[in-house]
Amino acid sequence: MTKILITGASGMVGKHLVDMCLQKGYFVKGTDIRYDERYSEEKYWGENFDFQHGNLNNYQRCLELVDDVDVVFQVAGVKGSPKRAAEQPNDYFTPMLQMNTNMAEAARIAGVEWYVYTSTIGVYQPAEVFKEDDVWKTFPSENDKYAGWVKRLGELQLDCFETHYGLKNYSIVRPANIYGEYDNFGEESTVIASLVKKGCNDKLLSVWGDGTPIRDFIHAEDVARGILMSYENKITEPINLGSGDGVRIRDIASIVATHYGKEIEYDVTKPNGDNKRLMDMTRADSYGFHPKVDLETGIKRVIKYYEHLQK
């Protein structure tokens, strides 16, 4: 039985990935810096699942975690808001650099069969449509400078392994803006989670900027599906994971506002960010990847999840 290590197993993507891998009959070792109570549920009591606490900034711990596995899905990351990323970038940069470097090197030394690295849309320069092969011809957006570069370095490390050791046993996935029902609804929440929280609790639904920027969103469940696909198909070229369809921030706000019966207030004193950011999905399409969770359904799932948390 193939043994898969999933880092970030308590996170938004990791939880879906754990469930999918178990459903497919893999042995799953989940690791995260925090334990999620969901793993106390009876369905995780079987012999095919093991959760282990793991701080990936500790290289020795990474070596221990990969010791008996065949495959690694490196999904762990550092969550946070664009504001914090801009004002306190080293809260992200150094921890991400350490955990990506440690886990990739540990996996190489252990001789794992396959390694999937979760990169980000932030590696791309400002453009209306992002194509995978454009990354190394350009620089990340100024709005994603630190997060973009640290994720690029993770990609570069795997390229380094290929050049130095002849290793080509890895996949790189670059998700668009991820959202889902296991998101963080605190101060560091992402766009959709933040809007749902405001819609539920505030008199007005306040939106940063004028709401015109166009973004590409993908549900965490579809990201998990893409990660699993990249491993099972042994995809060795970077692939985008997104919808390929743009949606304005104001359209997302409208879905949330309609659900809660709230008016929308646009705070034009706040920055819009890049005007348009879409994934080119041609390559992913060629491998048969198509997102299954449409945006409106996904947002309603987030709303239902958040409302459940408030009970």
Residue spans for each PLM region:
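NAD(P)-cofactor binding segment of oxidoreductase domains
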Residues: V72, A86-Y115
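NAD(P)H-binding glycine-rich loop region in Rossmannoid oxidoreductase-like domains
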Residues: L56-P95
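Active-site Tyr-X1-5-Lys
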Residues: E142-S171, G199-N201
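Conserved Rossmann-fold NAD(P)-dependent oxidoreductase catalytic core, especially the SDR/UDP-sugar
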Residues: T101-D144, S171
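Conserved catalytic-site region of short-chain dehydrogenase/reductase
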Residues: P82, Y117-K131, Y146-R152, H164, ...
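C-terminal substrate-binding subdomain of Rossmann-fold SDR/epimerase-dehydratase oxidoreductases
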Residues: C200-K311
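A conserved pocket-lining segment of Rossmann-fold NAD(P)-dependent short-chain dehydrogenase/reductase
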Residues: R84, K137-D144, Y170-N184, S194-I218, ...
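N-terminal Rossmann NAD(P)H-binding glycine-rich loop of SDR-like oxidoreductase domains
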Residues: I4-K24
